[in-house]
Amino acid sequence: ASTTLLTGYTGILDELLKAGVTNSAVCLSRLRANGFQGGKTIVKDYIAAHQHLVPPARYAVAPQGNRGRRYTTGPGEAYQMDWGFTKVSSYAGEEYSVACFAMVCHHCGEQYVEFFPNAKQENLFIGMLHGFRYMGVPQYILTDNMKSVVIRRDQEGNPLWQKDYEQFMRTVGFQTKLCKPRHPFTKGKVERLIRFVKDNFLAGRTFWNVTDLNLSALDWCDEQNTTFHRGLGIPQDIHRERCGTVATKLDDSPELLLYFCPERRISFDGFVNYEGRRFGVPYTYRGKTARVMRSGSC
């Protein structure tokens, strides 16, 4: 048998294909992380010749129809945000569900993603604040009609904000605009980002826990934001030059610290549950309420 650049790496490719990963860029990235020296063409050819390894699609997407005018904004004017839900593989061979918070600058495409065990409002606030630290605070956020943001609309169609979210907007200093009901494609950039996270970042990867997942996600965001995109450029450079002059720096006030540190009840045996893990505290604090914040690599 002849020897090629893929010799010794076909096992990795086969496992990716069996997991449904057919994106050549993703496969090439995984191979290069293991020492592969070849290019994308040979990887594409291998994928095309081994389509029988790819599991069949479970359903086909129906035609979406006319989506109206393209939504455009100025530099630093608006970010889009949304939740996505997916499963992540651990090194223990288990799968667990996570909520993916995604935020993207509508003008330049700079992106930020973070993962949480669920999509509760306290996690929405933490994800938004981390996104604002990463990209600055825009004039307004574009999102859909999630219950943690808006209760309902009045007879004139004006939103009735959820009271805690309304206070959060005042504290941070931004406004919120909502998509029309059943028109999620208005925020198509963040919808595509969530799909890209699932198909690119998560494809074929395993993580120890949510902390390991978020550290890897931040590195991935840095990589994507400093990569040249045809027709756009380098998002990070554009964001600094144009959007950074409009978006304001997040002021770490004492009021914001309360959003970073949600309350937790200390159990009778001296443990605090946070993000699916238990942390021990001195036994004398049992039954009391504490505030917990994720920091660094903890």
Language-model segments: which ranges?
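Active-site-proximal acidic segments at structured loop/helix or strand boundaries
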Residues: 194-295
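Two-metal-ion acidic nuclease core segments, chiefly of the RNase H-like superfamily
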Residues: 158-176
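Active-site beta-loop-alpha junctions of metal-dependent nucleic acid enzymes
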Residues: 113-140
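Short, conserved catalytic/metal-binding motifs centered on acidic residues
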Residues: 13, 27, 82, 109, ...
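Mobile-element integrase/transposase regions
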Residues: 4-19, 29-41, 45-111, 119-126, ...
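Short small-residue beta-strand/loop micro-motif enriched in glycine and branched aliphatics
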Residues: 109-114, 150-151
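RNase H-like two-metal-ion nuclease catalytic core shared by retroviral integrases
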Residues: 143-144, 155-156, 176-198, 213
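Acidic/histidine-rich, metal-coordinating catalytic segments
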Residues: 137-157
